[in-house]
Amino acid sequence: MDYPVQKSEHEWREELGNRYSVLREAATERPWSGELLDEMRSGLYSCGACGHELFKSGTKFDSGCGWPSFYESVNPEAVELLEDDSLGMVRTEVRCANCGSHLGHVFPDGYGTPTGLRYCMNSIALEFTPNATSTPQSPTDR
């Protein structure tokens, strides 16, 4: 797929630094290690490579898996879903539809969410921008 944001892998490597392996090589950060896992403020989550808007804080929930989880993207066109048969299992990879960077995986395992989906994202693949009037909230208030 051709993405609106096009850069050479050398350019990505220079720009992304320690984020490169996750965003461009589909690595996975260690569970419970991401800075955004416990982010409780209202705001917007964007692609850590290109800034494309991906998820609203109101769709974030605690799945207990060790990575930030969301039940839907800001719109269906914000992300690209691809079959991933690595590691001896079939999963659905989630990429940024604007630059093709790897974000994580989506699983249809429910958790009682409105969509029945769990977008399991790498914190290092996301940027968080709090709303101007944002204060910490409980997960049920988001």
Question: Model segments located where?
Answer:
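A short Gly-Trp-Pro
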Residues: Y3-R142
